[in-house]
Amino acid sequence: SRIPQVYGVADSSTISPEEASDYYCQRKAYIEEATVLSYGPAAAETALKLDDGTTEPFQYEFGFGTGSDAASSLPVCLFAVAVVCSVICAPVFASDYSSGADDIQRCALYGRKRLGGTRVLAALTLSAALYAACAAAFVAITLAVFGPDGTSAQLALDALVLGNLTMNGVLLLALVAGLLSVLAMTAFTLWLSAHMRRPVAVLAVSLAVAMSPTFLMVLLRGMPLGDWLRLLLPSGGLGLGTGMIVDIQAGKFLTLGPVAVWTPFAALAIPLLEAPLFSLLALYSYTRHEGR
């Protein structure tokens, strides 16, 4: 139960009926106190605004969020898909550089921008299709065994969950964030491949970036810098022990002066920007390489 957490006690049996009846007001105070302590007044104000639309009382329903470990196994699956996509995309440009095939291709009528654009689009489409297949299989198996879950995320995950979210909504957000992060990692790998001559080197750098969020959360645990660095990476939503579900659960913020951004919003917005950015950079780098 998340009730003892809100009241700051170890056992719910120590909470009187009068105190328990005031749970929702107590939870608001807990959110404000915890957020001010960790991120300052601006973040606390943002947190309370986000929580204004929360449906009360909270609902409990048995399903995948309360009866399985889907919340911990889904990030592992998403990370595995990202690694596979990186392996597939690493040689897209670099293999032709190393073999010399690029010298022939650049002399063809459509061997410059059109060929590069086609390769980028094909790689992104393949990654999206692979992700969709894996995500569909995961969701189908999970829902078939445990069923959907309308439990309020505040009960299933943490009292610091903000907004009107059920576990069904959390799963949907995690899948969307995973897709955006996989596409961002694919585009980043293509950019590396357009820059480097050896596919092995491209893959090594790509895998290092993919694993960086996990290491950052271990080395910089509890430090705002760790969240900044993690979420700015194209793999920010794919680390083991990190990701959208953890961000929703932890009630974290990115703060810059008076501005505070809830980390789940950043986990959606940043890869949405990085995927087209790195795709364009990959195409630009490939075109420049052809002109040398």
Where in this protein do the model-derived segments appear?
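Secretory targeting signals
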Residues: 16-96, 117-196, 236-265
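Residue-level recognition of pore/gate-forming positions within transmembrane alpha-helices
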Residues: 122-123, 207-211, 275
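Junction motif at the cytosolic side of a transmembrane helix
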Residues: 269-292
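Short helix-to-coil transition segments within interhelical loops
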Residues: 106-112
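Transmembrane helix segments
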Residues: 199-236
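Cytoplasmic juxtamembrane regions at transmembrane-helix boundaries
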Residues: 99, 107, 191-210, 288-292
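Transmembrane helix-loop junctions in multipass membrane proteins, especially transporters and channels
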Residues: 139-151, 198, 222-226, 283-291
